[in-house]
């Protein structure tokens, strides 16, 4: 345990003061708003961009300068008039600004880390891409046997998130402001029935940052244990850090297994218990080449360690151990499974020829069409059966504006899901968006889709719904013939840093 504490102390060696004065600077809110301005038609709070203005920010900063408004009385909720009648808008503005501020220490830490290793800042756009995980899965998961499917729970109390951030930020005023937000809205964050409304939708970036910082705290310990496991591969979880017994256990294992015929088949558990861990938000996956007993030991150890040292309460039904051969797991809007790719090799020796059937394991990644149809139905692009419908829009939006919004959604979706091995599902989603756009325009002009397309022509829709193939041809015109075969295969773009809105059909944090 002392080694773990020293490890964490090194990670927390950089702390930053005086972040609280930045809350009173107008440019902070401008940066925060510009960074999150690219909201699509699927935005949970479309009115926020229309109501945002520098005048409102100045008025909010003036109210924050009056310290008596920050006094919170637990007995009389009406006494605190800090947010006033515009509490939802003010709350979101403060939340986005505060989220931008508290990310500064982590950004500085990343820059200093890169400078320390290479004496210069490295362009790490590809390393930030969340889709870079799928080439990793294709390269490493094909030879694994078991997968541990984990749904990480919320912390039991908001103060845990504040204490986690306190390791990095020593500014007490900023931490008090964070307590102000969490204490008033904690129930709406952890209650499933309330998690889809109110505070969470308006302040999602802030809470995701706090949650990820807390998860990274115990994931750093997990990385430490994984590094130490290279010396302790056969040690049970109860004495996982006691190196003194390691070699003795190895000798006893050899004495036991040497009497078994399949000694080499069993000894690999001691030599190479390959483990891979990936996570996005609350979804985590731990894959291994070991046996069910080996994975159960990891499960018991991690649950016990996280509950005792990080106050995370895991329910047994949140963690599943499945065989990769007959189980598909969902991650980042994709569904991945391990399938056998048959191949036939013809071998000829003199006058005799033989056909040798080989089966190669391959990770197959595709789009789960049914959850996406449900997500499109909730966003009013289609009904539950997948039939496109017109989407209600504001009357002051022009036709080109509506087309641009639908086109942006379609192109982003194609860009995000270009790695799918089943293109049929991708084409179906494009068809729904294309026809929904046509019906939306026809509804605006109070006519039918057929009449609208005859009057304006189908080119109106085709010019903004460029397929990935067209984009590749426009980017590489000289290699258009060779790119035809490339487009039929999967393409992973390494410039995507957030999950697609439509792909995130699961309940968010």
Curated annotation (Swiss-Prot):
GO terms for cellular component: chloroplast. InterPro entries: Domain_X (IPR024937), Maturase_MatK (IPR002866), Maturase_MatK_N (IPR024942). Keywords: mRNA processing, Plastid, RNA-binding, tRNA processing. One of its GO terms (biological process) is mRNA processing. The keyword tRNA processing applies. It is found in: Plastid. Belongs to the intron maturase 2 family. MatK subfamily. Usually encoded in the trnK tRNA gene intron. Probably assists in splicing its own and other chloroplast group II introns. This is Maturase K. It comes from Castilleja linariifolia. The gene is matK.
């Amino acid at each position: 345990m002392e080694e773990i504490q020293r490890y964490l102390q090194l990670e927390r060696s950089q702390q930053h003061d005086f972040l609280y004065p930045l809350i009173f600077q107008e440019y902070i809110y401008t940066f925060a708003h510009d960074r999150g301005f690219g909201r699509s038609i699927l935005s949970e709070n479309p009115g926020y961009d229309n109501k945002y203005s520098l005048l409102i920010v100045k008025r909010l900063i003036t109210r924050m300068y009056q310290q008596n408004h920050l006094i919170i009385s637990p007995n009389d909720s009406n006494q605190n008039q800090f947010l006033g009648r515009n509490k939802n808008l003010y709350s979101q503005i403060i939340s986005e600004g505060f989220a931008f501020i508290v990310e500064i220490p982590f950004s500085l830490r990343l820059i200093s880390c890169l400078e320390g290793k290479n004496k210069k800042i490295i362009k790490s756009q590809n390393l930030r891409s969340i889709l870079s995980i799928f080439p990793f899965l294709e390269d490493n998961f094909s030879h694994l046997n078991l997968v541990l499917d984990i749904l990480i729970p919320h912390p039991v109390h908001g103060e845990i998130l504040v204490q986690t951030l306190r390791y990095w930020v020593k500014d007490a005023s900023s931490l008090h402001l964070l307590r102000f937000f969490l204490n008033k809205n904690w129930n709406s964050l952890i209650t499933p029935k309330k998690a889809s409304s109110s505070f969470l939708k308006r302040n999602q970036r802030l809470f995701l940052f706090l949650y990820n910082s807390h998860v990274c705290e115990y994931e750093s310990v997990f990385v430490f244990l994984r590094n130490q496991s290279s010396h302790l591969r056969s040690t049970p979880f109860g004495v996982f850090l006691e190196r003194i017994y390691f070699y003795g256990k190895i000798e006893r294992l050899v004495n036991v297994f040497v009497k078994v015929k399949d000694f080499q088949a069993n000894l690999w558990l001691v030599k190479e218990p390959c483990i891979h861990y990936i996570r996005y938000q609350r979804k985590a996956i731990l894959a291994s080449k070991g046996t069910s007993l080996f994975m159960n030991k990891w499960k018991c150890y991690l649950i016990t360690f996280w509950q005792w040292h990080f106050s995370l309460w895991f329910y047994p039904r949140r963690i599943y151990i499945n065989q990769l051969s007959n189980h598909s797991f969902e991650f980042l809007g994709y569904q991945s499974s391990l399938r056998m790719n048959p191949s036939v090799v013809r071998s000829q020796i003199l006058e005799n020829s033989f056909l040798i059937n080989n089966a190669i394991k391959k990770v197959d990644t595709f789009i789960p069409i049914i959850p996406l149809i449900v997500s499109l139905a909730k966003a009013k692009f289609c009904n539950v059966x997948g039939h496109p419908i017109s989407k209600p829009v504001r009357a002051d939006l022009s036709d080109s504006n509506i087309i641009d919004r639908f086109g942006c959604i379609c192109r982003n979706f194609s860009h995000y899901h270009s790695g799918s091995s089943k293109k049929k599902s991708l084409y179906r989603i494009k068809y729904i968006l294309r026809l929904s756009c046509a019906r939306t325009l026809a509804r605006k002009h109070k006519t039918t889709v057929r009449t609208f397309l005859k009057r304006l022509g189908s080119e109106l829709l085709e010019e903004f719904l460029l397929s990935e193939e067209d984009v590749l041809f426009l980017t590489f015109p000289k290699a258009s013939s060779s790119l035809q075969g490339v487009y039929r295969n999967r393409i992973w773009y390494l410039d995507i840093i957030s999950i697609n809105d439509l792909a995130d059909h699961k309940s968010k944090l």
